[in-house]
């Protein structure tokens, strides 16, 4: 049995949605195009069952943004529904090309700014999506795994998941 046959016999967990954060919009568009092409051309037969709702689509990308206020603070905003979806969020925390203004001054986004935006989008999606998965090429704040002095363990402070709705990072 080929891998495609296994894939054809596997039921989707939920309708697929993809969020490409501003730091990796181009990559997110390429992933979206590949998934659209794959689902249109490779999978031969999709059942008319309610389990396959929105299986084939022209676009899996979710329109979202993290607008900034004049002070540099931001908020996560989802511009379409993600209720009941299998949500994948893509981000690149090492992208230093993005900028925003604080009190009229141009500021480059740091890895911490990208990570905060990721947490804002996760917060906006929590309780609505069936599953939330994060695709992040560089696991930010993971370098420190034990304490040697009075110092923080930043990654260990992240408790995002609810018992019934896991979030994979």
Role assignments for model-derived ranges:
Residues 11-22, 87-90:
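Short hydrophobic beta-strand segments
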Residues 158-169:
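Single conserved hydrophobic/aromatic residue that forms the stacking wall/gate
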Residues 48-98, 115-119:
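Active-site-flanking structural segment that lines cofactor/substrate pockets
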Residues 138-140:
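Active-site-proximal loop/turn and secondary-structure-junction residues that shape catalytic pockets
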Residues 62-72, 103-126, 148-157:
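Glycine-rich anion/phosphate-binding loops
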Residues 24-31:
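Short N-terminal binding/cap micro-motifs at the start of the first secondary-structure element
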Residues 97-98, 142-146:
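A short acidic, helix-capping loop that chelates divalent metal ions and anchors anionic groups
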